[in-house]
Structures are given as structure tokens and as C-alpha cells.
Regions:
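A short beta-strand-turn-helix
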Residues: 32-53
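Short pre-active-site segment immediately N-terminal to redox-active cysteine/selenocysteine motifs
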Residues: 50-53, 57-62, 128
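Bacterial N-terminal signal peptides
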Residues: 8-16
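Non-globular targeting/processing and membrane-anchoring segments
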Residues: 10, 21-34, 38, 160-178
Length: 178
């Protein structure tokens, strides 16, 4: 476990050297991920059609990451028309087959899962996984949370983004849905 943490920290430092760290309210660099079905999704593409985009970075080797995915799936079902979702593994050895196994094991139905998130993850300067970020339609970071967010908190965050015109920069989870 200690070796894994050191390796992850080293990778994060290397990656953040190639990306400017996205601070709350500042632009998020565009990136593209590979979806389970082999298609590509770019952050910029979703930002053209959605009010905001939720980025959820996870790693299969952390059990708690998978525990958060049902909450993300529920949010996708509720807010998917207004908010884009990029749910992406940061694991370099992740494959379409391992994503399919994770989907089956966690009873995920329609939540889109993607590969290739490690370099995009680095731009947020976080040492924690899972990481949840909401990007405003203008491409700026509107919310960032390290760790398991949970269904109720995620719902409160996304409700604010759906109901607000213009960019947000929320430092904490709202106490109640507005």
C-alpha cells in the first residue's frame, strides 16, 4: 500500500508538471477519453451542449471508488440531460473488459465509463482518488471534491449547477438542494 501511494504521488508530480494545475474558477484543459464502446469523448464537446460537465476519476484497485459509482449513476439518471458526465479510470492497465466487469459487479446500467483519465487527473493537483470535479459550461472549474462524495451531496451540488445561469465556483457542498 505504501509503495502504491509513493508511485501514485510520483506519477501525480510528473503529470502536474505537464499540466497547469486547475484551480477553482480557472480554466480546465481539454482532454479526450476512450469510452467502453471505443468512441471518443472530449470535454470540449460536452461543454458545447451541456450546462456543466461532471468529471469523476476513479481507480479499480480502490474498493471505495467502486462504492461511489452507484451514486454517480443515480446522478447521471437524474441530471444527464443537462449535465455531461465523464466517468473515467485513472488506471493505466484498465481495459474495456475490466470496465465491463466493474459495471457488472456494481450493477451499473447506463453510466458511461471511460479509459485514459490519468493525464487529465493530473491537472487538478489532487493526491486523492476518487476525485469529483464539475466544470462550468465556460470551461472553468466550478467544484472539486477529493474522496467519496456520496449520493445526497452529489445531488445537492448538481442541483445548483442545473438551476444557475453562468459559471460557479463552489468551495463546499451546499447544505441543502436549492
Amino acid at each position: 500500500m505504501k509503495q502504491t501511494f509513493v508511485l501514485l504521488l510520483t506519477l501525480m508530480l510528473i503529470l502536474t508538471a505537464s499540466f497547469a494545475v486547475a484551480q477553482l474558477g480557472e480554466p480546465v484543459q481539454d482532454f479526450t477519453v476512450v469510452n467502453e464502446n471505443g468512441t471518443l469523448t472530449a470535454l470540449s464537446g460536452l461543454l458545447q451542449t451541456k450546462k456543466a460537465v461532471l468529471l469523476h476519476f476513479f481507480a479499480g484497485w480502490l474498493d471505495e471508488d467502486y462504492s461511489d459509482l452507484p451514486a454517480v449513476q443515480a446522478a447521471y439518471a437524474q441530471y444527464g440531460e443537462d449535465i455531461g458526465f465523464i466517468v473515467v479510470s485513472v488506471e493505466e492497465q484498465e481495459t474495456v473488459q475490466s470496465l465491463a466487469a466493474a459495471r457488472a459487479q456494481n450493477e451499473l446500467t447506463d453510466l458511461p465509463l471511460s479509459l485514459g483519465g490519468l493525464s487529465a487527473f493530473g491537472q487538478f493537483g489532487s493526491a486523492y482518488i476518487p476525485l469529483t470535479v464539475v466544470v462550468n459550461a465556460d470551461g472553468t472549474s466550478g467544484f472539486e471534491f477529493d474522496g467519496v462524495l456520496g449520493a445526497e451531496a452529489l445531488e445537492r451540488v448538481l442541483a445548483v449547477f442545473v438551476r444557475t445561469d453562468g459559471p460557479l465556483a463552489m468551495e463546499t457542498v451546499p447544505q441543502e438542494a436549492k
